Amino acid sequence: MNQFVTNTKNVIRGKYHPEFLQNEVLADIFAHTAQTLPDKTALIEADKTLSYGELYQQALIMAQHLALKGVKPGHIVGLWLPRGIELLKAQLAICLSGAAWLPFDMDTPADRIAVCLEDAEAVGMITTDEWYEHLAEVPQTKWTNTELQKPLSESVSLAKTTPDQPAYIIYTSGSTGKPKGIVITQKNICHFLRSENSILGIQEQDKVYQGFSVAFDMSFEEIWLSYLVGATLWIAPKSLVSDPERLCQTLKQEQITVLHAVPTLLALFPEDVPNLRIINLGGEMCPDSLVDRWALPHHQMFNTYGPTETTVSASLELLERGKPVTIGKPLPNYGMLVINSERELLEQGETGELCIFGPSVAQGYLGRPDLTADKFIENPWAMSVEEELLYRTGDLAKIDEFGQVHCLGRADDQVKIRGFRVELGEIEAALCDIDGIGTAAVILRPEDGIDQLIAFIAPEIDAKQAIEIKELRHNLSQRLPPYMVPNRFEIIEEVPRLLSGKIDRKALKARPLTSVVDRSESDQPQNPAEEILFEILNRLFPNMPIKLDSDFFDDLGGHSLLAAVLISNLREHAEYSHLTIQNLYQARRVGAIAALMLEQPEPTLFDSQIGQDNPRNQTYKWLCGIAQLVTIPVLISINILQWLAPFFTYHYFTGGTRDSIPYAIALSLLVYVSVIMSSFVLSITVKRLLMLGIGAGRYPLWGLTYFRWWLADRISNISPVYLLSGSTLLNLYLKALGAKIGHDVTISSVHIRMPSLLTIEDGVSIGSQVNLENAKVEHGHLVLGSIHLKQDSYVGSYAVLEENTVLEKQAHVNALTSIEYDTVVPEGEIWDGTPAQKIGHIDEQAKLPERPKLSFIRKIAEYGYYGVSALIIACLFFIPIFPSFLLVDWLDVNVFNINPNNHLQIALYYFILAIPASAMMMMITAVISSGLRKIALPRLEIGTYAVHGSTYYRKWFAAQILETSLQTLHGLFATIYAPTWFRMLGAKVGKNTEISTATGVIPEMLTLGEESFIADAVMLGDEEIKGGWMSLKATKIGNRSFVGNSAYIADGTVLPDNVLIGVQSKTPDNREMYDGQTWFGSPALLLPAREAAEKYPDHLTFKPSIKRRLMRGFIEGLRIVLPAALAIGVGYMIVLDVIDVINNYNIETGLVALTLAGLLYGVGCFLIVALLKWILIGRYQPRSAPMWTMFVWLSEGITSLYESVAIPNFLNYLRGTPMLPFFLRILGVRIGKDVYMDTADITEFDCVSIGDRAEFNSFSGPQTHLFEDRIMKIGQVNVGNDVVVNTRSIILYNANVSNHAVLGPLTLVMKGENIPAKSAWIGSPAVPWVHK
C-alpha cells in the first residue's frame, strides 16, 4: 500500500509507512538527537544560545527535581511561563520526567488556569517567581522554574514512560461551558512528527522560526520537528510576533529557513523573504492570493489541516500558483472520508462532515465519556487496528475527483474568531452562571461588515435585579479570553428554540437588534452642551440608553455616516460649529464629546482674514467673456489640428491610382512629429509673451491680467507634456516657460499654474501628479504667488502646494499632503497630512547611497535619449490609426460603396465604418504597448536604482509606453476589460476585480486580490524617487478590498482582505492594518464602523450570470470604441470638406474652414453627450443600484463619453469662463449667477446644486456617487452662495456646504456632513482652517 488508495465512496488514505510506527516516546527522540549532535545549537533567544547537549543536561536536572517531588509517568504538570528558552527547557523537563505537560498562554486568566488544572487532575504547575502570586487561588502545587534548576547533590533515576501514556494535553473551548481537554499520547505525537516531516523535509541544517504560543499545537511543529532532525530553533520575542514588517526583516537578517505560520501573518509581510526554504501554513483558510504571492521557486509552500484531536495536522498540500487551494491529501498512515448526518459515506463531490482516522487520532476527551463517544466513533471502513477510531471534525468538506479535500467551514456551533476556535456553548454557560440570567444564546453574525459575537439573554423569571451590561462584560472578562466576550448583549423575554429543544440560531441571526430600553437608564445631562448632545443622540439611537461613558461606536452602534450626521447636527449650533468628524473618532465617548463641545475654538482663517466678499465687476466679466469667446475657437482648432493635420496629410496623398500608401504614412508621421514640436514651441512662446511683466499679487477676476493668465494657462495645455514626465526634458520645458530650475532636479509630473513664479533648487525631487497651485481664484480675485523649493527638498505624489510657500533645504512633504499659502516648511522637517503638520525630522537621506553624479555629457545624452524616445513612442502609438484608415477605405470601396449626399450623412456613414476600425486600432495599440513594455523591461525587481542609470531609463521608457497608450485606451478603465489589460501589462489581477482610472501603476509590482475594487483617480503604488534614487516595492491589494476615489496607495503597501480605504485617503503603516478594517483621511484614521451597504443579491454584485457579463461587455465595448469612431467619422467629413475647399479656393481658405470645422466638432461633441444623457438616463435622482445592472452600465457609459469626448474637445476650453456654467445647466446642473468654474468634473449632473458667486478651483468638485460593496450610491450635493472651493477639494454626496464657506486645498467633505456658513475648513476629513 504505497500509493493513495481511493474507493468510489470517498475514502482516501495517505501513503503507508510502517516504519513511522515505532516503540518510542518524545524523550527518546530528543535524547537521540542530543547524543548524536551534542554541540549543535538547539535554541537561540536574543544573545542566549543552548546546544542540544546543554539543553538536555539542564532539562534533565529539572526533570530530576520533578521526580523528587513525586512527578511520575502518566501525571499531568501545568506549564505557565513567558516565551523563551526557559519555557522550552521546562517543557522538555516535564517530557523527560515521563509526565505530560498542560500548556497555558501568557495571557490566560488565572480562573481559567485553575479550571483546567482541576479538570486534568494535574499534580502541579511550573511558573515564574513573578507570576507565582497570580496563582494564589490555585490549589495545585506550584514550582518555579528557578527552584527546579538548583544543583542536585546526586543523580536521580527517572521512570520510563510508555507510548500509550499522555505526552501533552491541550484545552479548547467546550460547548457545555467547561473547557475540554484533549489527551495526545506519546505514540500519537511521535508518529505525527515522522509522518509530517517525511513530506515537509525539515533538515538538520535548517534554522526554524519559533513564534507560536505553546498553548497552540502548531508550536509543536516548530519545536519538536526541529528536535527530531536536530535543526536550530530561533525563539522570537513577544514584541516581534505582532510586528509583521519588522518580523519580515528579522527573518532575513537571521537567515531563517523554515517558517510555520497562519496565513494572516504571512499576508502582512511587505516583501518576499528569499531565505525561507519552507513555509508551512495552518490554523485557518489560506487565500489564493497568498499562494500567487508566495509560491515562488525558492520556497516550498505547504498548507496543513488538522484539529488538535488528530495531533496537530492530518493532511498537507504543496501549494502552487494556478492550482486551487485545498487542504490536500492525508499524511502518511492517515485517512479521511466524508459522511452525512446519518453517518453514511458520501460520494466524491458531495458535501458532508469530514472525518479523520489513523495512528495519531487521540483516544478522546479527558473525563468526558459522553462527548468522546459522540466525536470519536468506530470506523466501519477501517483496514487495520490503527484505523479503528474515526474522529468527526465538525467541518464541512468534500473530496474531489483528484483526491483533494476541500474544507468548507464549520458544521456545528463552533466558530472561529480572529483565528481562535470558540464553542458558543462555553460563552453561553459562562453567562448562565451569572445571577439573574435564565437562558443565554450566543451567535456570530456580521454587523457593519464585521463578524461580531451577539449574546441574547433571557432573565430569570424571579430575577431580583435588572441585568447590567457593564457588569456582564466585567464578569465575563474575568472568566474568558477577550476574544470570547460578546460585542453586544440583547435582553429578550425568551430564547427561540427548535422542536428538538435546541436553540434556533437561524432565528437569532435574522432577529433585528432593536430591543427597547428604558430611558431611565440614560444619564441625565448636566449642562446645555450635554442637553443638545443627548437630544441628537436620542434621535440617532432611539432604542439605546445614552450614558456619558457610552462609546459612540462600540456601545451605541455608530458608524461613519451617523458620525457625519451627529457632527453636522451639532454644527447647526453656532457655538459648536468648530467640531470635526475627527474629534468624534478621537473622543468616542459621549462625555468626552460633550467636553470638546465646551472647549473654546481657535480663530479660523475665515474669522481672521477673509470674512468679506469682493463684488464682481460685471463689465469686466462680459468683456473678458467676449475675448475668451473669440480665442476659444482658435484653441480648439489648434488642439484638433494635432491629430487632424496628419489625418489630412494621409488622405490628401492617398486615393489616386499612383499614390503610395507607405509614402503617405511616412509623410503623415513627419507632420505628426512637426505638430508635436510646434505645439511645444507655440505654448512656450505664447505663454512667455502673455505673462510678461505679471508678478505675484491679487488681481480682479475677469480683468485684463486674469484674461492673460487664463489664455496662457489654456494654451499650455495644447502640448503633450506627458511625453516628458519623469525626464530631464521636463525640467528644460519648465525653464522655457520661465521657471528657475536647478541642477539634477527630478520631477515625475506636476501641474503648475504660474511657472514664472516657481523656483526649484538643486537636487529637488517631486513625485507624480503634484499640484503646484500658485494661482487660484477666491472672493473675486485672481491670486498669484511664488513657490520656492530649496536644495534637496522633497514633495511626494498627489501633494498640493499653494502660493507663497517655501520648502527649506531637505524639507520633506509627504504624499497626499497640502501645504497652504504663506507656509514655510523648516529645514529637514517632515510634514504630512491635510492640513499638514510636522511629524518628524528627515533622516531618509542617510539611508540612501550618495546621490549619483550627473555630468554635463550625461545630461546632454539624456536630453537626446528622452527626446528621441518620446517622439518614437508618440509615433508608435499613432501608427495603429493607419490600419484603421485602410479598413475604413476597404469597407467603403468593397463592402458598402455608398455615396452620401450631405455633411451629416458623410459623418454618420464614416462613423459606422469607423466602429470596427476603432476596435481594431484599440487591439493593435494594446498588443503594441504590452509587447513593447516586455521588450523594454523584460524583468523588474524590487530594489533601489539610480535615476541616471540604465534601469531607470528602461523603466521610464516602459512607463511612457503605458502613459502614451492610455491616450488611446483610456476608455478601457472602469470596464470589464480593464483587468485583462492590466494582466497583459504584467500585473497579477484576481478574478472579478474592478479597476477604474488607476495611475502611477508599475504593473510588474502590482497584485490585486479577487473581487477587489480600485476606484477613480487612485494613485496605485507609484515608485518613490528621492535623492537621485528610484525605489521600487511590490504593492498588494487583498481580496474584496476597496480603494476609494483619489486615494493614495504607496508602493510597498500590503492591504489585507476586506479593507476599505476612503476617498482622498492614504493607508497607514502595513503593520497597523488588519482584515475588515476601514481607514480614511490623510493621515489615515481608523474608522471603528462604517455605514452598512444596502443588500442586493450576489448575482447583481459579486457573482453575475454569464448573460449579465455578456451584456455589460457589449455595452462597455461600445463605450470604448465610440469616441475613436466619432473622431474618425468626423475626421473623414472634415478632411473631405477641406480638400474640396482647397481644390476650389486656396490653402488659406482651407485653414479657415479647418478652424471652423474644429469649433463645430467641439460643440458637436458636447451636444452628442448631452443628447445621449437625456435619452438614456433622463434626470438623475438620489438612488442606489448594484453594479451588474443596466442603469449602472449606461450611467458609467455617459460619464466615460463625457470625460473622453465632451471635456477634452470642448469643456476644457470653457474652464474659467462665464460660458461653462451655461453648458453645465444644459446637462442638468442647478447653478447660480456669476459662478466661477475652473473644473468640469461633475458626473450625476442633476444631483448638483451650486449657489450664486461660488468659486471652484482646478481639480475640485462635487462627487455625487461612490461604489462600495459593488453598489453605486448616488446622492445630492448642495453648495451655497459665495462658497470658495480650492484645488483638489471633494464634496461627497449628501453633503451641504453653506453660504460663504471656504474649503482649503485637498479638503474632503464627508457624506452627510454639513459645513457651517461663514466658516473655513481644510483637511481630509475637514477641520476648521486655522492658518498658522
UniProtKB/Swiss-Prot annotation:
Site (Important for substrate specificity): residue numbering on this chain: 218
Every Carrier domain range: 524-601
Catalytic activity: n L-ornithine + n ATP + H2O = N(5)-(L-ornithyl)-[N(5)-(L-ornithyl)]n-1 + n AMP + n diphosphate + n H(+); n D-ornithine + n ATP + H2O = N(5)-(D-ornithyl)-[N(5)-(D-ornithyl)]n-1 + n AMP + n diphosphate + n H(+)
Cofactors required: pantetheine 4'-phosphate
Cellular component, GO annotation: cytoplasm; plasma membrane
Residue positions where O-(pantetheine 4'-phosphoryl)serine is found in the record: 560
Result of knocking out the encoding gene: Cells lacking this gene show a similar growth as wild-type in static or shaken cultures but show slightly higher biofilm formation.
Sequence intervals crossing the membrane: 629-649, 664-684, 868-888, 908-928, 1120-1140, 1151-1171
Effect of residue 221 to A: Loss of amino acid adenylation activity
One Pfam family cited in the UniProt record for this chain: AMP-binding_C
EC number: 6.3.-.-
Effect of mutating residue 313 to A: High decrease in substrate affinity
NCBIfam families assigned: AA-adenyl-dom, NRPS_term_dom
Family: Belongs to the ATP-dependent AMP-binding enzyme family.
UniProt function note: Catalyzes the polymerization of L-ornithine, generating poly-L-ornithine composed of 7-12 amino acid units joined via isopeptide bonds between the carboxylate and the side chain amine. This polymer exhibits potent antifungal activity and thus may have a potential role in survival benefit for A.baumannii. The reaction occurs via ATP-dependent adenylation of the substrate. Can also adenylate D-ornithine with similar efficiency and thus may produce D-ornithine polymers.
Notes concerning its domains: Consists of three domains: an N-terminal adenylation domain, a carrier domain with pantetheinylation motif, and a C-terminal transmembrane domain.
Protein name stated in the entry: Delta-poly-L-ornithine synthetase
